[in-house]
Amino acid sequence: VYERNRPYDTFGWGVVFSDATLGNFQVADPESYEEITRNFHHWDDCDVFFKGRKITSGGHGYCGIGRQRLLNILQARAAALGVKQVFEAEIADDADPRLAGADLIVAADGVNSQVRKKYAGHFQPDIDVRKCRYLWLGTNKLYDAFTFDFRKTEHGWFQAHIYKFDDSTTTFIVECPESVWLAHGLDKADQEQSIAFCEQV
């Protein structure tokens, strides 16, 4: 595994898996599954706050886990299986000599994948870029359910995607259409100003 980042780098806060996804983990690698389930926060309810009402829907089955904890679990499992892991190693091209002799190359280099661009004629990707803006935050306020909170402002709607991922932390993603983001002047706001605006909304 060649990873462009350092071993314990992470971006964002927590990630979410459905019960169905966890079931796939259990089939593919029971050891990783057991470690993940020892470290996650599970819930069945989804709370939606819209126009002053709270609507709760149950039986969904999701779990949240910290991104860094998940990376640590997967790195430890790979090491236990004898997988060579090279960190701070950028692979810019599948013709990189470090990949010579590989039976399979999996390039997980994000939405702007250079490998996908290189082989676009073969893969025929269908990429649909949208214009929503979001801010991925974390808070120590704990929520009992996966929460969607919609708030209307003078220029349009904001929504928050909220989920607890450990005993003390919740992911709090704030999203809005780009037109609303621009109308509120958030394109000129720094991080602190953006967070203060979200707190006020």
Predicted features and spans:
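Intrinsically disordered, low-complexity boundary segments flanking structured domains
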Residues: 1-3, 34-36, 52, 120-125, ...
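A secondary-structure boundary/capping signal
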Residues: 2-4, 87, 107, 177
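Conserved FAD/dinucleotide-binding core of flavoprotein oxidoreductases
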Residues: 55-60, 66, 81, 144-201
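Conserved N-terminal helical subregion
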Residues: 19-136
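Extended, Lys/Arg-enriched charged tracts that mediate electrostatic binding to polyanionic substrates
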Residues: 138-143
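Adenylate-forming
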Residues: 135-137, 172-173
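Glycine-rich FAD pyrophosphate-binding loop
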Residues: 1-12
